């Protein structure tokens, strides 16, 4: 989001991030900004963004991430003229996109979502109150802990209904689960661990999880394998045999600069022990 906002400025801004962000392919966003007349020195952080955005048109493949569209919408108050966006692909992470559209609407944006969107400058009017939902994507971490220790650490009803809670409920159904993470790929690691200890199942709709802080399909396989839990890659996600239990790893667990992988490994280690390498990345989610 910062990159899109910086691109509206008449000048150059250098943007950098931690190791996990430096590993991410940001080409969907950087390519879009170049189509709008900006200079972007690289497709990965660190890079220099030289604006401003000029009126024009481009397209976004929504099957990769919701973040490119969200960033452009949030930056649009700084536009100097109309920008036309054509949307392609099967959209993922639609809940987060919807949150962007809802909060922008509360702040004065009069546009809406569609296959073709026209964005122009608008005046931000700060609302008196905006309710930000709780970070429900951390719920499976709590559920995993409870499953391992027989506790009830969190009132899961407080999160209401969402694509993430739907996926969690399917995984908890008590049978062989078929879970789509089209809109909830962030929870793939803890959910796979939970399913492996239950009846098992398949996770689908998670191809875009490969573009996170790590390739979360393969990194989840590697991490769980270290705990003696065996799962397999499929075309869209993971195939997970049930009836498994974690064992103490024989060596350090590489958290791969991925905070969600590190949190899942840490919870498993509370039951069987283990040494984590790079667990400090958890501060991305929980500073301090």
Residue spans for each PLM region:
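Short, structured segments at the rim of ligand-binding sites
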Residues: 1-288
């Amino acid at each position: 989001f910062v990159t899109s906002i910086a691109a509206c400025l008449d000048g150059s801004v250098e943007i950098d991030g931690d190791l996990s962000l430096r590993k991410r392919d940001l080409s969907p966003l950087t390519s879009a900004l170049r189509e709008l007349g900006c200079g972007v020195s690289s497709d990965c952080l660190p890079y220099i963004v030289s604006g401003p955005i000029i009126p024009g048109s481009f397209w976004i493949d929504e099957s990769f991430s919701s973040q490119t569209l969200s960033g452009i919408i949030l930056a649009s108050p700084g536009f100097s003229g109309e920008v036309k966006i054509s949307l392609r692909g099967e959209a993922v992470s639609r809940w987060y996109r919807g949150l962007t559209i809802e909060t922008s609407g509360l702040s004065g944006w009069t546009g809406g979502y569609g296959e073709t969107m026209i964005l122009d400058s608008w005046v931000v009017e700060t609302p008196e109150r905006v309710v930000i939902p709780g970070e429900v994507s951390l719920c499976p971490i709590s559920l995993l802990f409870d499953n391992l220790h027989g506790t009830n650490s969190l009132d899961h009803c407080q999160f209401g209904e969402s694509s993430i809670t739907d996926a969690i409920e399917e995984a908890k159904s008590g049978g062989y689960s078929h879970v789509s993470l089209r809109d909830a790929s962030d929870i793939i690691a803890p959910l796979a661990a939970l399913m492996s200890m239950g009846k098992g199942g398949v996770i689908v709709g998670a191809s875009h999880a490969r573009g996170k802080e790590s390739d979360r399909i393969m990194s989840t396989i590697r991490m769980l394998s270290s705990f003696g839990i065996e799962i397999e890659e499929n075309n869209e996600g993971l195939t997970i045999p049930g009836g498994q239990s974690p064992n103490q790893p024989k060596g350090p667990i590489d958290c791969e600069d991925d905070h969600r992988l590190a949190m899942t490994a840490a919870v498993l280690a509370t039951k069987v022990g283990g040494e984590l390498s790079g667990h400090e990345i958890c501060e991305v989610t929980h500073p301090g």
